[in-house]
Amino acid sequence: MSQIVVGPLLRFVSDTEATLFVETDGECEVEILGRTEPTFRIEGHHYALVRLEGLEPDSRYEYEVALDGERRWPEPGSELPPSVIRTLDGDGPLQICFGSCRVALPHEPPYTESKDTDEDGFEVDALRMLARRMVEGDAREWPDQLFLLGDQIYVDEAAPETRERIRQRRGTDTPPGEEVADFEEYTWLYAESWREPVIRWLFSTVSLSMLWDDHDMSDDWNISVAWLEEIRRQSWWHRRAEAGIVSYWIYQHLGNLSPKELDENDVYRQVRGNQRADEPLFEWAREINATGAGTRWSFYRDFGRTRAIFIDSRAGRVLEEDRRAIVDDEEWDWIVQHAHGDFDHLLIATTVPFLLSPAFHHLEAWNEEMCDGALGSVAARASEKLRCAVDFDHWAAFQESFGKLRDLLSEVAEGKLGSAPGSVVVLSGDVHHAYLCEVGFRSDGKHRSPVYQAVCSPYRNPLDRKERRVVRAGFTGTLTAFARTLAKLAGAPDPEIRWRLLDGPCFDNQVATLEFEGRSATMRLEKTVPGREDDGALEQSFERRLV
């Protein structure tokens, strides 16, 4: 009889609908709450996205998962609470947890020790501690949503069991060595990353939204045209890239879509229930890898009176000799179309921060001008190498896109695109530290809703002491003044906004929580403590009322 390999993952949830994802070890029919869905098959792996419709708003449904009529979830002997689906209440309070960057490592010494005291230390997983608190706590205090904003897996730092399986399967003497090479190895990494019982329970009970970042595909993915040209010369890259696209679509993106969007998705229509789905899915992935076209990865979710727009900040980049952009014009038009007011709160989720520390913003803007030839071709080539070496790949390094998002935020906050919301918050991860900034626009006499940049990273992958010193320097006046001068001399445009650090930077394994009630909003950051895994091991770093 078939067994569950990955999942169940609770994905899209509205007031009357929900979708749940499972991977199984054989072809079967998956049943949840009386709804059934046949699996589809990709290179010997079997998947289903079960759709539940006609649910009651503001309701709680305990559920089990059956494969061909045999119960497979919860697992026999599990002491975890029942998995539940909680449909939305359009007018009620909303709690969203978010963050990014989570390595898959054992939860035992030395891996749970501080990185400063043990080279193998990655400290304690913040999501694991969140789940354990939920298990022991009041269900009325559980988060409604969990945003995973990039680097859900690390293909270039494969988890221990995946690395060992790679050694046994093909060896590591030739590229890409211990990194993931194809779809089969991607499936191992997802399974190892999401298989721990308490994480499985968390993902089965809190609705998940996901965006990919570079480590889901490759370190520095799509940082520049020079990087892209170099990686495409590697014999192993195209197979990796196609596998990365297919695996992301299956494990992460598919569940971001509503039932209506699934009905309209041409690729899903070809794959659903198909026992030979490899051909259409990999053909589609080859087209995307070759041309960069073929899909829009950005999406949006409405949670009652709060709208969240999730911007794909990696796959859809424009990388040309004379132009750089985070997304192309067509996708940007889609973002503008959906980023209107008329909500109590507007969230813009983008894996890479819109606003960095002021010094590093100016350094990235300077670097882009240098790459574009501000001081000639020799300096441009050196600047491209610097861009990759120090990860200058955020919105500040794509000034065209930075300016567009800045202006969009201003227009929404002014009420030019519908009624002004109570708050506008940009949510990001990627940078392995957390902070909260308030955005200041030019003094023009116009009233604007408060606008914030909220960053939370990592769930589990902390910086070492040296890296932390570099990050802190970016918030100092001395380095900011120096970097601003460099950027100005190179011809970089002024950002035309200023931002004030309210809280942080914080360098722990951590999880952020946004709480909304009516037009009020609060942000809280909580951290884990190296070596400590008791049920009270999440400690508050800061809490701030946003509006």
Where are these regions (language model features)?
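Metal-dependent phosphoester/phosphodiester hydrolase catalytic core
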Residues: M1-V547
